[in-house]
């Protein structure tokens, strides 16, 4: 039984559906749904591959946002409760 783990879309106004924050938001929702699916179906390797692709896309967007605007990046990380990027 899959529970709806999606994050409330009220965080993002309708005008900003293409912004980096909204893209990270929607990718995070997909990550949560795929993670729940993989807990039930552990051998679904195509879904595992899809999860890795989504995670890499989200990471690219977060790297871009952290370089462009650190305050927006920090705010987004706090709202979505995801880990910060590893820095060298």
Swiss-Prot record:
SUPFAM superfamilies: S15/NS1 RNA-binding domain. SMART domains: Ribosomal_S15 (SM01387). PROSITE patterns: RIBOSOMAL_S15. This is Small ribosomal subunit protein uS15c. One of its GO terms (cellular component) is chloroplast. Belongs to the universal ribosomal protein uS15 family. It comes from the Eukaryota. One of its GO terms (molecular function) is structural constituent of ribosome. It is found in: Plastid, Chloroplast. It comes from Pinus koraiensis. Keywords: Chloroplast, Plastid, Ribonucleoprotein, Ribosomal protein.
